[in-house]
């Protein structure tokens, strides 16, 4: 081992050397993709980003039943097919479990839209999502899915289709890569990080932060901004040194403030080892990972402490101490009175669902963003359990609603989105007048899911019945630059044996009218990915009609494929 010395290396040199090293480690196809990304990144090194923007991707694993997430309203031309074919899973607009009506403003003013096309209903467990939609904070994109090329029922048997079309694992990877016709190498967020990383000057941690472990969507090709995992409790710490290193350090934010006890001496010895270089490449590689983890831990810890210094004006714990604003907001939204809890005990948050804890941590990291020093941040979170082949929930023959898994899942989603959105609005108000103040326009949350589920149920009993694997699904976006109160794309006619569904099936598997890249490319552009780099991040995008327009033409499948109607973001 030798003493560590810094070797002067600017970004351009580092990236060039990284590209050269890749030539000996990957195949020619991977290397060409790598080089394209490096070329795009090098082209951006002369510019920098002056504002802050955070993209949050929420993946609903298991394939949520989008047919009961967004339903046609009573006046919608698709309603008759919904009532006829949804069977025991159908959710009437009245009854003991009423749905929530919404009106798509863009379709209400669209002359070419069929009469009543603007009327929809949201699942009964989504009252706050209805409010988000009505207020303009949230929009929905209909019938999005993985596509190799534009596809319709008449070409289904003659064009290339996404491999393993109805397989969970394959479709999850294809949504995250946006390259369904290629073996997985990287995710679309990872490729964005490859391109934008050079403009994130002086960043403290990676652009790519995951609250749901290592994932596919943030996997890059160049590894200049590898994904960094944070738990619901914060950064992963070294074990054996107490909470926030209280047994070894006098100041948790100063990694050299060692105590004179055995824990302090042990941590100092460990730190000294990390300050050496190692001749063995594996040893040095491991050492670098541990060292970077310790540094990231400090930055994340500082960001979370910064966020928690913002106190709620009324919420106090069982000892009369004020709660951090964001934590109290999430607790209140989930019906938990924080006054009976001890806010120094992290287990108090155990009553929150996992999705809520993930979004709470993301909200805190956004509030503490100055400690992370990234102008662009990519967050990933997830919520599983949506594979409702049974026990989905529906009405029995005597008109009594039998609650199921979809009800519980939508309730968790509703509360988490509402609490997160409330925190983003409140953060804008709290920081008003500060330097680099946060704006509600500074974030977008976008959902993904494996695929939709069949319109027709797989049984005729409300309790045990569910739905099966399908294709085109409905996703949503939330944030200040989202053109809210609108439904984009094209909503299916819900005829399970018609032109919208896959041939040979009478279950209602909608062929997507919008590809994953047509939905995600606007998100990349919002992050300031240049037009010339979009083709590098989304190589298949030019196979489809441009999503950067508001043209709407529902006169036929060809017209819909030519006019995707994905103009859901402002300022791009």
Feature locations, PLM:
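Short, conserved, surface-exposed binding loops centered on an aromatic residue
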Residues: 370-373, 434-439, 462-468
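Histidine-centered active-site microenvironments of extracellular/periplasmic hydrolases
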Residues: 449-486
């Amino acid at each position: 081992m030798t003493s560590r010395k810094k070797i002067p290396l600017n970004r351009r040199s580092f990236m060039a050397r990284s590209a050269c090293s890749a030539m000996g480690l990957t195949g020619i196809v991977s290397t060409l993709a790598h080089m394209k990304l490096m070329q795009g990144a090098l082209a951006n090194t002369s510019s920098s980003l002056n504002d802050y923007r955070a993209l949050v991707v929420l993946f609903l694993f298991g394939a949520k039943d989008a047919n009961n997430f967004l339903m046609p309203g009573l006046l919608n031309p698709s309603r008759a097919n919904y009532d006829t074919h949804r069977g025991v899973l159908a959710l009437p607009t009245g009854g003991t479990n009423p749905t929530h009506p919404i009106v798509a403003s863009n379709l209400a003013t669209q002359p070419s839209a069929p009469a009543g096309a603007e009327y929809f209903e949201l699942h009964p467990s989504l009252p706050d999502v209805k409010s988000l939609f009505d207020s303009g904070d949230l929009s929905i994109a209909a019938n999005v899915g993985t596509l190799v090329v534009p596809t319709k029922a008449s070409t289904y048997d003659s064009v290339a289709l996404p491999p393993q079309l109805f397989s969970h694992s394959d479709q999850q990877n294809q949504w995250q890569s946006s390259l369904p016709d290629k073996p997985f190498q990287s995710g679309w967020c990872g490729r964005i990080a490859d391109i934008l990383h050079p403009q994130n000057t002086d960043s403290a941690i990676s652009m790519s932060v995951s609250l749901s472990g290592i994932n596919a969507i943030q996997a890059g090709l160049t590894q200049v901004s590898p994904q960094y995992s944070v738990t619901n409790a914060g950064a992963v710490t070294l074990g054996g040194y107490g909470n926030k290193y209280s047994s070894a350090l006098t100041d948790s934010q100063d990694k050299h403030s060692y105590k004179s006890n055995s824990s302090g001496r042990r941590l100092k010895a460990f730190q000294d080892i990390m300050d050496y270089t190692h001749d063995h490449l594996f040893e040095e590689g491991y050492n670098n990972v541990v060292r970077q983890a310790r540094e990231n831990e400090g930055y994340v810890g500082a960001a979370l402490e910064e966020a928690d210094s913002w106190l709620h004006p009324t919420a106090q714990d069982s000892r009369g101490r004020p709660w951090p604003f964001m934590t109290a907001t999430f607790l209140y939204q989930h019906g938990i009175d924080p006054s009976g809890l001890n806010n120094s005990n992290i287990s108090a948050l155990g009553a929150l669902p996992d999705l809520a804890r993930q979004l709470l941590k993301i909200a805190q990291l956004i509030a503490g963003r100055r400690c992370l020093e990234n102008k662009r941040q990519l967050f990933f979170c997830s919520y599983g359990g949506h594979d409702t082949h049974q026990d989905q929930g529906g009405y029995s023959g005597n008109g009594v609603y039998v609650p199921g898994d979809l009800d519980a899942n939508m309730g968790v989603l509703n509360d988490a989105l509402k609490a997160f959105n409330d925190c983003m609005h409140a953060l804008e108000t709290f920081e008003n007048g500060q330097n680099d103040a946060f704006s509600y326009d500074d974030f977008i949350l976008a959902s993904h899911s494996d695929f939709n589920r069949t319109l027709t149920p797989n049984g005729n009993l409300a309790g045990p019945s569910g739905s099966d694997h399908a294709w085109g699904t409905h996703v949503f976006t939330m944030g200040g630059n989202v053109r809210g109160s609108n439904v984009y794309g094209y909503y299916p006619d819900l005829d399970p044996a018609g032109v919208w569904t896959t041939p040979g099936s009478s279950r209602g598997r909608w062929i997507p009218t919008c590809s994953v890249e047509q939905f995600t490319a606007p998100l990349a552009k919002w992050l300031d990915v240049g037009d010339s780099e979009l083709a590098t991040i989304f190589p298949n995008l030019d196979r489809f009609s441009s999503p950067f327009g508001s043209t709407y033409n529902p006169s036929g499948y060809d017209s819909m494929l030519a006019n995707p109607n994905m103009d859901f973001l402002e300022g791009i």
